[in-house]
Amino acid sequence: MKVGIIGAGFVGATAAFAMAMRGSCSEIVIVDADNAKAKAQASDIEHAVPFSFAMTVRDGDFQDLKGAKVIIISAGVNQKPGETRLQLLERNANIFRDIVPKVVAIESNAVIVVATNPVDILTSLTEQLAGLPEGQVMGSGTTLDTARFRALIGNELGVDPQHVHAYVIGEHGDSEVFAWSSANVAGLSIPSFCKARQVRWNEEIQSQIADNVRKAAYHIIEGKGATYYGIGAVLARISEALIRNHRAVLTVSANIPEFGVALSLPRLVSGKGIDGLIGVQTNDEERAALERSASVLREALSAIS
């Protein structure tokens, strides 16, 4: 199966490298306006292939996306230190207005995965521009935030994060919502698990975890200029779910008519794309926060629609 990646920057290249190391697909095509950069990234990753899984990694143009099962769009300008994801919107929206129609004209059967920030609004824009069937466009959403959330909870509780079931929903950004009320380990709520295991837990710890997740990208950008390893792994995981029909539950972003914008909720991701909305149990406070998050996104989307 072929995966096309549009954008040879940090995120696109790291996603390609993650796929090569994981054996996510049989062919990767990297497309970028800077042809020399796309060629260099593809060559560099191709030289790592003998140490992982057999596959083809090459550069190409839009025509080479024909036949791709998954097309990842990671093209765009980088987030500056101190800049919110929403402030990126106008700079990246014009790039998508150019790219998306070209992608659909060449391969309308591919599932489009948006990775460029602000990902929720650009996912909404991509859905509008593409005109593809429901479920065929998604954003990486809060998949990385959810992984960070589970990792920090697991570290605090002394549990493998893979056995922590907790979700970050809403915007991939400052208004994201932590669904604490449904978070659990082995079917036990976090407070119940901590009581049974005699692990210290209080609102201060809970608030610190949420704050660390929300500010993670800002700290990384401040230290090295960009985030890419985490999101690269996320894009590899999403691609595998699509290519191998994993029917994985992931907090990808997609449009919800009820909210009038794309945002993240747990969804079933299969070979056909988004195969249904799973949703998540929330309390009144979390539901209100989710509605506020949707309002933030709608306001930003209205500025470019």
Curated annotation (Swiss-Prot):
PROSITE patterns: L_LDH. The active site is at H172 (proton acceptor). Beta-D-fructose 1,6-bisphosphate binds at R150, H165. It holds the Pfam family Ldh_1_N. NAD(+) binds at V11, D32, K37, G76, V77, A115, T116, N117, S140. Its EC number is 1.1.1.27. Keywords: Allosteric enzyme, Cytoplasm, NAD, Oxidoreductase, Phosphoprotein. Substrate binds at Q79, R85, N117, P118, V119, D120, D145, T146, A147, R148, T227. GO terms for molecular function: L-lactate dehydrogenase activity. The modification Phosphotyrosine is found at Y218. One of its GO terms (biological process) is lactate metabolic process. It is found in: Cytoplasm. Allosterically activated by fructose 1,6-bisphosphate (FBP). GO terms for cellular component: cytoplasm. It catalyses: (S)-lactate + NAD(+) = pyruvate + NADH + H(+). Its main location: cytoplasm. CDD domains: LDH_2. PANTHER family: L-2-HYDROXYCARBOXYLATE DEHYDROGENASE (NAD(P)(+)), L-LACTATE DEHYDROGENASE. NCBIfam families: L-LDH-NAD. Homotetramer. Catalyzes the conversion of lactate to pyruvate. This is L-lactate dehydrogenase. It comes from Chloroherpeton thalassium (strain ATCC 35110 / GB-78). The lineage of its organism: Bacteria, Pseudomonadati, Chlorobiota, Chlorobiia, Chlorobiales. The gene is ldh.
